Amino acid sequence: MSAQESCLSLIKYFLFVFNLFFFVLGSLIFCFGIWILIDKTSFVSFVGLAFVPLQIWSKVLAISGIFTMGIALLGCVGALKELRCLLGLYFGMLLLLFATQITLGILISTQRAQLERSLRDVVEKTIQKYGTNPEETAAEESWDYVQFQLRCCGWHYPQDWFQVLILRGNGSEAHRVPCSCYNLSATNDSTILDKVILPQLSRLGHLARSRHSADICAVPAESHIYREGCAQGLQKWLHNNLISIVGICLGVGLLELGFMTLSIFLCRNLDHVYNRLARYR
């Protein structure tokens, strides 16, 4: 076996093994997405997180899993069977994915102000219509998750929620906000949250906790909710995690470039004379 044949054989099995790994990874991601769709309650208990945007995550995970499995399958079969058509299709899919990522990066950099305005409009619309439209459940769950994770409330400030009609309290009642705004560390009275949620849970029955955005908490004092708006919270999160985000994007891009280079190299250097059909006889 010549040095060139040894190199091609090494590249072939390298592509096969790594794409097999990504195929298994895609299968697991797809299974998690299906799990969420079938049994949301057990998934929430498993991950141990509150205010998880289940509807969005189930679709994202399922689609991502199918896409990952599809690309990995092309790489596995194309490399193992030395099929130029599959290797070329594998290269094209990776190139399209890489170009899409570059385009998104450029758009985010050049249209940042417009994206911020669009995001603000979407969030303000979600806040104003909170709890009034069953079709907006996914958006409400997502915003609850953002508030819970970033420890913030509202877009500009917590008072954004006080303008929502169904949450507004009268002179004798405390204001109400989504429970994702509630700051448990601000008070030692851990029963306040339960006093508000439990009556709702009793009415929901077996559907209790299936939609966390339905949880509304009374706030006896503004000190019991996060004081920072999520606009500032998002800016802080991006600033603190900028290096990690850039590192992950660069890592994914380099990985895609590496697989593209290996696949096109293998595709161009396969023996033109060898009859691929002979091995199937």
Curated annotation (Swiss-Prot):
The organism's place on the tree of life at top rank: Eukaryota
Q: Which membrane topology describes this protein?
A: Multi-pass membrane protein
Looking up InterPro entries in the UniProt record yields: Tetraspanin/Peripherin (IPR018499), Tetraspanin_animals (IPR000301), Tetraspanin_CS (IPR018503), Tetraspanin_EC2_sf (IPR008952)
Keywords assigned: Cell membrane, Glycoprotein, Membrane, Transmembrane, Transmembrane helix
Any one GO CC term of this protein is: extracellular exosome
Any Gene Ontology biological process: regulation of humoral immune response
Subcellular localization is given as:
Cell membrane
Expressing tissues: B-lymphocytes. Antigen presenting cells.
Modifications the protein undergoes after translation, according to the UniProt entry: Tyrosine phosphorylated; leading to activation of downstream signaling pathways.
Q: Which residues lie on this side of the membrane: Extracellular?
A: 39-59, 112-241
An example Pfam family from this entry, by short name, is Tetraspanin
User: Which residues bear sugar attachments?
Assistant: N170, N183, N188
Cytoplasmic membrane side: 1-17, 75-85, 267-281
The UniProt subunit note reads as follows: Interacts with SCIMP. Interacts with SOCS3. Interacts with DECTIN1/CLEC7A.
Family of this protein: Belongs to the tetraspanin (TM4SF) family.
In terms of PANTHER family, this protein maps to: LEUKOCYTE ANTIGEN CD37, TETRASPANIN
Q: What does this protein do?
A: Structural component of specialized membrane microdomains known as tetraspanin-enriched microdomains (TERMs), which act as platforms for receptor clustering and signaling. Participates thereby in diverse biological functions such as cell signal transduction, adhesion, migration and protein trafficking. Upon ligand binding, two signaling pathways are activated, one acting through phosphorylation by LYN leading to cell death or a survival pathway with activation of GSK3B.
Protein name (database record): Leukocyte antigen CD37
Q: Which gene encodes it?
A: CD37
